[in-house]
Structures are given as C-alpha cells and as structure tokens.
Curated annotation (Swiss-Prot):
It comes from Rattus norvegicus. A motif (PP1-binding motif) lies at residues 84-87. This is Protein phosphatase 1 regulatory subunit 3C. Acts as a glycogen-targeting subunit for PP1 and regulates its activity. Activates glycogen synthase, reduces glycogen phosphorylase activity and limits glycogen breakdown. Dramatically increases basal and insulin-stimulated glycogen synthesis upon overexpression in a variety of cell types. Residues 149-257 form the CBM21 domain. The keyword Mitochondrion does not apply. It comes from the Eukaryota.
C-alpha cells in the first residue's frame, strides 16, 4: 500500500483523483469496525456526540408554574363542588304538605269579645255613680293679705295656707314671736266635736323671715270613712308665756265638707241630716266691678295687694 492510499484510508473524504475498487473495499471494511469507526470518525461526529451526552442542568424541586396553576384552579369556580338537587321523595318524605282547617269558629278572647261600637253604646247607657269628695269650706287665708295681716296682729296666731291631697291635710301657721318657748297645735274633730284630737305643729326655720314672727307646719291624715252627717272642723291654738291664743276663723272654725260630683259635672255640697242647709242660688250674671277695685284685684291677682305698697313686704306686725 502506498502512502497515498494510507492517507485516503485515514481521511474518508473523497479524493479528486480516481479511486480504485480495492480502496473502496478497504474503506467499507474499516467503516464497519467499531474501534476504528470511533477512532477514525470525523471531528463533527465527535463534537455532536459530545453535546448529546452532556448532562442537562438540574431542575428546581418547586415548580412555579405548577403552583400558579394550582392556585388558578383553586380560585376558579370550576374547582367547587357542583350543587345537586335532591327531591324529598328520594329520601322517603312527602312531596306535599296538607293543612286541615276547621269550620268551627274559635272562642273569642275575653278582652276582645265586645266591639268598640258595642262598648260605646253600653257606656252611653250607664249612669255615673255620684262620688263623694272632701273640700275646704273656706278660702286660703293668705289670699287676702290685708285681712290676713289684721287677723294676725289681733290674734297673734293665724292659719297661713292649707291644702288637702290624698286625704291628708297639710298647712302652715304664722305666730308672733312673744317668747322663746312656743307650742302650736291644731285641734281637729271628725264627728262634730263629740271627740277631738290635738296635733302638734313643727317649727320651720325662717330663711327670709323676720324675728317678729315664726312659722310652724302640720300634717293630718283623715280617716278613710267619714259619715256625711258628721262635721269636720279644726282650729289652731298657740301657747306662749302661760297664755293661749286661738285662731278659729272668726268663731266659725275651719271646715272640711263633703261634696258630690254629679254626672253633669256640677259640684254640690252635702248638708248634714240634722240641720237645714240653705244653698245660695248661683248668680247668672257677674256684678259689675270697678276696674282696679280691691275686690277685683283680690279675685284675679291676690298678690297685687302686697305689691302696691312697700311696707306690706315687711313682716306681719
């Protein structure tokens, strides 16, 4: 074998010159031999095999794409369980509900057994019972200041005001300060002076008063049942310096009388059975009075009598 042929064997690329059959057979034989094929292969084949057998880079354990895909599937409404419709008969229940109504009417309630119209007719046919009440049979003493001051100067004791509420009589008494030790009592009777009771009064501290007079208060509970034929009267006694001063409303006593409320709203006084009571007829017209007269002022504005003169604002003298 010549050198030229050896070069041809080592270099399988075709030559420009003519190739002999022996050379072709030699190439075919050498090409099918594994050791020589791997050794005599072209550089391009070696380079291609090197890239094929090169190890690939490792992939991360956590796949971001798969995590995003799982989140997308979790947020997607298709991932929720589908709703199913189950009928009652599939579980052994009835498909219909039966309600039975009775033709008999129910018993009416006791508080609704009457209609409003029936109640109106019944109330119009009823007669109102006469209700007995107790009222004072005297005006408030301090309403007429001039008269009150005169009586106070003369008797040294005088009832100032009085009220009746819930069958309890309360009031205040004015007395002259003639001594340090004083005793004021209210003597009251509920059976036309067959018996009487003395009730002690309580001293009240005068904040804006003078040293010439003192004020006492009292509270008397009336009996629950008082016959209409019996009189309820009281007076006031004042003990000072061994003397007793009385205020008995100019010898008439202070009276509490029974009255009856008629269905028409008129209030009439009940007269005792043992005496003849004459009721003064009501005046149909008011008597004309001079504007600014004491009678008109005392009836409408009793305090005007004390506002008109400065000396009336002083203590009772």
């Amino acid at each position: 074998m010549s050198c030229t042929r050896m070069i041809h064997v080592l270099d399988p690329r075709p030559l420009t010159s003519s190739v002999m059959p022996v050379d072709m057979a030699m190439r075919i034989c050498l090409a099918h031999s594994p050791p020589l094929k791997s050794f005599l292969g072209p550089y391009n084949g070696l380079q291609r095999r090197h890239f094929v057998n090169k190890p690939k880079p490792l992939k991360p354990c956590l796949s971001v794409k798969q995590e995003a895909k799982s989140q997308k599937e979790w947020k997607s409404p298709h991932s929720q369980a589908k709703k199913r419709v189950v009928f009652a008969d599939s579980k052994g229940l009835s498909l219909t509900a039966i309600h039975v109504f009775s033709d008999l009417p129910e018993e009416p309630a006791w508080d609704l057994q009457f209609d409003l119209l029936d109640l109106n007719d019944i109330s119009s046919s009823l007669k109102l019972h006469e209700e007995k009440n107790l009222v004072f049979d005297f005006p408030q003493p301090s309403s007429d200041y001039l008269s009150f001051r005169d009586r106070f100067q003369k008797n040294f004791v005088c009832l100032e005001n009085c009220s009746l509420q819930d069958r309890t009589v309360t009031g205040t008494v004015k007395v002259k300060n003639v001594s340090f030790e004083k005793k004021v009592q209210v003597r009251i009777t509920f059976d036309t002076w067959k018996t009487y009771t003395d009730v002690d009064c309580v001293y009240l501290k005068n904040v804006y008063g003078s040293s010439d007079s003192d004020t006492f208060s009292f509270a008397i509970d009336l009996p629950r049942v008082i016959p209409t034929e019996e009189k309820i009267e009281f007076c006031i006694s004042y003990h000072a310096n061994g003397r007793v001063f009385w205020d008995n409303n100019e010898a008439q006593n202070y009276r509490i009388v029974h009255v009856q409320w008629k269905p028409d709203g008129v209030q009439t006084q009940v007269a005792p059975k043992d005496c003849a009571f004459q009721q003064v007829p009501l005046k149909t017209e008011l008597e004309p009075t001079v504007f600014g007269s004491p009678r008109l002022a005392s009836g409408l504005f009793p305090e005007w009598q004390s506002w008109g003169r400065v000396e009336n604002l002083a203590s009772y003298r």
